[in-house]
């Protein structure tokens, strides 16, 4: 199917697979496999046709920025192995750590919000105002009506 000069489309490839190998599982499976082969460079895609990629063509560049070229080390340099990943394991033979003593704060105050101090009931709060005025906003003063006589 792919040996034609101008390539083969998806339907021709599926017909070829059905005649050669029998039943196809699904059209989408074939499409996804063709896309994978196209992305990896095994197949070339041109005008809705898939064709075998040229074996002499240079490999496709990967996505993103290429890595920096490594500078060769001078001869005689010993390269240490890279550090292992993750947290190092605990030493089972190490003595147990002593518990830390709690450090008292420098100010001498306890942490958090202070406790509510209860007031002694000996000093009653004044309930009535000594001036005799009622609480709140004073009422609006209404002007007094005067009788006006109309003489004719």
Swiss-Prot record:
Family that this chain belongs to: Belongs to the HMGA family.
Molecular function via GO: double-stranded DNA binding; methyltransferase activity; nucleosomal DNA binding
InterPro entries to which the protein is assigned, alphabetical: AT_hook_DNA-bd_motif, Histone_H1/H5_H15, HMGA, WH-like_DNA-bd_sf, WH_DNA-bd_sf
Major localization class: nucleus
H15 domain: residues covered: 1-54
Protein name: HMG-Y-related protein B
Organism (species): Glycine max
Gene3D superfamilies attached to this UniProt entry: Winged helix-like DNA-binding domain superfamily/Winged helix DNA-binding domain
């Amino acid at each position: 199917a792919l040996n034609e000069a101008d390539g083969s489309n998806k339907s021709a490839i599926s017909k070829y697979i059905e005649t050669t190998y029998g039943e196809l599982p699904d059209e989408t499976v074939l499409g996804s496999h063709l896309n994978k082969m196209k992305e990896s460079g095994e197949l070339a895609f041109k005008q809705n046709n898939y064709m075998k990629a040229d074996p002499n063509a240079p490999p496709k560049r990967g996505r993103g920025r290429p890595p920096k070229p490594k500078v060769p080390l001078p001869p005689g340099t010993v390269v240490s192995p890279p550090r292992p990943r993750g947290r190092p394991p605990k030493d089972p033979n190490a003595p147990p750590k002593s518990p830390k003593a709690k450090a008292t704060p420098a100010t001498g105050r306890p942490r958090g919000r202070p406790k509510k101090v209860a007031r002694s009931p000996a000093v009653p709060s004044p309930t009535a105002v000594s001036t005799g005025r009622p609480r709140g906003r004073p009422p609006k003063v209404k002007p007094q009506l005067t009788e006006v006589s109309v003489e004719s």
